Amino acid sequence: MEHLYDGVTFPEPENLLDWGPETNGRSFKGQPLEELVRRWKIASKDPDKWWCRYPGLPFSTEGMQRTTARRAAYQKLIRDYMRCGATVDDNIGKLLKTLDEMGIADNTIVVYVSDQGYFLGEHGFFDKRMFYEESARMPFVIRYPKKIPAGERLKDLILNVDFAPTLAEFAGVKMENVQGTSFVNNLEGKTPPDWRKEIYYRYWTNHAIRPAHFAIRSDRYKLIFYYAQNLDMTDTGNFEFTPSWDFYDLQNDPHENHNAYNDPKYAPVIKQMKKQLLNLRKEVGDTDEKYPEMQELLEKYYNKDMR
C-alpha cells in the first residue's frame, strides 16, 4: 500500500481553511494541521520518538505560504489515512471470506467499530476530542444476515454503552444494571417510540487549545459548554480561558461553520437544551458535586440562565 494514491489529489473539506475562533466564532482554537506538521518535523529528525511515528517522512512545509502549507499537510494526512483504510479493508475482506468458507457467515455477528471519529482536515483540524460531528460520530457497521436487513442506515442516536446489551440480546443473554440500551429492535427496523432524543458528551482533559467541556446533541441541535477546569486532571497546565458556550443548528449549518449561541432566534431552543443537558447530567450521575470550583462556575455561567 506504500504507493497507493501516489499522484492523487483528494477533495478538500469546505472548511479546511478555518483558522480559528475568528473564522467561525467558536470558543476554542482546536488542534490544527500545523501541529501535525510540527510532529512530522520532529519525527523526521528523530524517528525513535514513539509518539511521532508516521509514514512517508521526511516531510516539510517550510518556505510555503500558510494556505499552501495547510493544503499540503492535508493531502499527506488524507493519503496516509486512505492507505491505512485500504489495508484494513483488505483484512476485513479476508475475514468475511473465511466465514463464508467455514459456512458460518449467516450465523456470525460481525461488527466494525471505532472508539470515536477523527478530523481529516475539517475546520483545519486533525485528531479527535472536540464535539464536532467528525469527532463525535463513531463508525459502526454490523452484519448479521439472519436478523439484520442489509444495506440499511439508522438515524437513531446510539451510544457505545449500547453495544454490550445489544450483542448480549442477540446472544440470548439478559444484562441487568447497565447504562446502555439494546438497539436490536432498531436494527430490525422497529425503533421503539420512546427511544432517546438526545445524547450527553463529556471531555475531561483540559488544554489551552482544547478545553474541557460537556455537551448535548439532539437530531438537529448541539449545545456545548466549555468549562475549562482541570479538576482531577493534574498534567494539563494552567491557562486563562473564560467559560463559554457553542451552539449549532445541524440542519441549517451541517458543517458547524458558525457558532450561533448569540443568535437571538435560537434563545428559546438554547434555554430548553440547557434544561435537557442538566437532566442528562443527573441521569448519568455526572453532576460535579464533589468539585466546589465547578459548582461556583456553574452558578455563574449556567444556573443563572435557568431562572
Which role fits each region the language model picked out?
Residues 273-277:
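Short amphipathic alpha-helical coiled-coil/interface segments
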Residues 54, 287-290:
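Signal for well-folded cores of large energy- and translation-related assemblies
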Residues 263-266, 289-295:
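Mature extracytoplasmic/periplasmic domains
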Residues 116-122, 161-164, 169-246, 250, ...:
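C-terminal cap/loop subdomain of S1 sulfatases and analogous C-terminal strand-loop tails that border
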Residues 1-158, 169-178, 232-245, 256, ...:
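Active-site-proximal cap/lid insertion segments
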